[in-house]
Structures are given as structure tokens and as C-alpha cells.
């Protein structure tokens, strides 16, 4: 995924394919064959809800882009969208998110 991608799979199909346990069916997005950085898109992620001990696989609508830890505000930060697989675990902007906050776009 470089600068754009296509997103046309029905969310119910994503739930089935990836074993999603938590999903709000009212969160919908129109199919797009030109999803740009900072656009909303579906993401599959494992997160531990507050007060629980184990992660839950979720399908959520998120904005595509990583806000760096040093940004003072998510609204004004330049969102990063691309990392090299060979160095993602080394680069300061990606190291911590790569270790603990990954998701499938």
C-alpha cells in the first residue's frame, strides 16, 4: 500500500473473514476504489476494552494515517501513511506503534 488503495469489501464479509467479535453495523462507508491518506476506512484490530483482561477483535472505522507520538495535536499533525517493512521496527515514528498498536486496513 503506497499512497492509495481500494476498499470495496462489505463489512459483514470482513467480520466473517477475520473473526471479528465486536462491530457496530451502523458504521458504514461507501465502497471506494481511490481511498486517499486521511480518509476514513475500515480497520480490523485487537484491543483490550477498559475493565477487561483479554483483547477483542474489532472492526472499526478509522482515519488512515499515523499521528506521530511527538505531535502536539492529532488535528494539526502530519499523518504518516507509509513505512518500509525492513525498517518499521527501527524508525522512531513507527517503533512503538508497530510493537503494540497494529491493525489491518
PLM features: residue spans?
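Short linear sequence motif anchored by a di-proline
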Residues: 1-104
Amino acid at each position: 500500500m503506497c499512497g492509495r488503495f481500494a476498499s470495496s469489501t462489505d463489512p459483514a464479509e470482513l467480520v466473517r473473514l477475520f473473526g471479528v467479535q465486536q462491530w457496530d453495523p451502523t458504521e458504514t462507508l461507501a465502497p471506494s476504489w481511490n481511498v486517499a491518506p486521511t480518509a476514513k476506512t475500515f480497520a480490523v484490530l485487537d484491543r483490550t476494552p477498559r475493565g477487561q483482561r483479554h483483547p477483542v477483535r474489532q472492526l472499526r472505522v478509522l482515519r488512515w494515517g499515523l499521528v506521530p507520538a511527538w505531535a502536539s495535536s492529532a488535528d494539526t499533525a502530519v499523518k504518516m501513511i507509509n513505512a518500509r517493512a525492513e525498517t518499521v521496527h527501527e524508525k522512531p515514528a513507527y517503533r512503538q506503534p508497530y510493537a503494540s498498536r497494529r491493525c489491518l486496513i
